Amino acid sequence: MNRSPVIGITTDYKEKENTYSKYPWFALRRHYSDCLYKFGCTPIVLPITETIENIDFLDGLLISGGDFDIDPKYYGENTQSDKIQTIKDRTKFEFKILEKYFPLNRPILGICGGCQLLNVFFGGSLIQDIESFI
């Protein structure tokens, strides 16, 4: 029996009060898992953790998007705009998981902020505030 591909998906993370919960929470937009199911994959939600022990079982990695910015320190810049909103724990986790997963030579997809993270991970930079740039 063939096993369906197992795809790990990173989650969004919020600590703010007066949102969904007064406690920190993870979120994943449903369309990520719906699309993977549609194409015969088994999605696995990857909550943000301090350590990353076992990701060898993943056949692919999807770095999801979110409503935040990559901390400019990751691409060698200081914060130049008060519009920058980072989620330090999430970005740190996603960099750690990429460091462990990339050497496995398996598929990685970044969507929206995930694509930006991949760009920075591989040495690229970002425009911090497009409105002031143009």
For each feature predicted by the language model, list its residue ranges.
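N-terminal beta1-alpha1 cap of cysteine-dependent amidohydrolase-like domains
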Residues: 1-109, 120-121, 127, 131-134
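Active-site loop->helix "elbow" adjoining a glycine-rich segment at hydrolase catalytic centers
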Residues: 113-115, 122
